[in-house]
């Protein structure tokens, strides 16, 4: 069976308007991250179908924070890394001393192959580390280009919205202090978090 492309042509559903006062937001599922401060910043936890962009300088701890989140959650998590091997991630995870039986690790950069694994695994949270390493076979340019970042982000956003699976994207910061890639990326996602700290 061919993989779902998670684009608008993949769904047959017709969108219908709902009067604002008839929309039930009490049913919007949120799940706690296992970190009180992160829950507070996210307004009470991760929202189903939300896309979060976590930006920060290289080496500041974005990957470590998200790996810790993946291991603390009592949910099935797929952690996709375009920067580290599965063995490197396992070594970092082992040092944390947290349960590893619900976290799956994939070293991959092509979105079509990632979506094939997502379809097979059906994770409850998808973490992409990082958006700048991804590429779509539908676009000619290389990973990290403006068109690749825009396209791969759009594919992941459509996936999140159509499945209600939250997606966290890691974004690297340039020397100027902005997230690398097109400025539109920050407008495409639901939440942008800037991770800062002392090294």
Regions found by a protein language model. Name each.
Residues 13, 28-35, 59, 82, ...:
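Conserved phosphate/pyrophosphate-binding and hydrolysis machinery centered on Walker-type P-loop NTPases
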Residues 154-199:
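Phosphate-binding/switch region of NTP-binding enzymes
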Residues 3-6, 10-20, 119-121, 132, ...:
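Conserved P-loop NTPase
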Residues 1-52, 72, 76:
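Detector for small/aliphatic-rich hydrophobic stretches
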Residues 41, 89, 129, 171, ...:
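Residue-level signature of catalytic and energy-coupling elements of molecular machines
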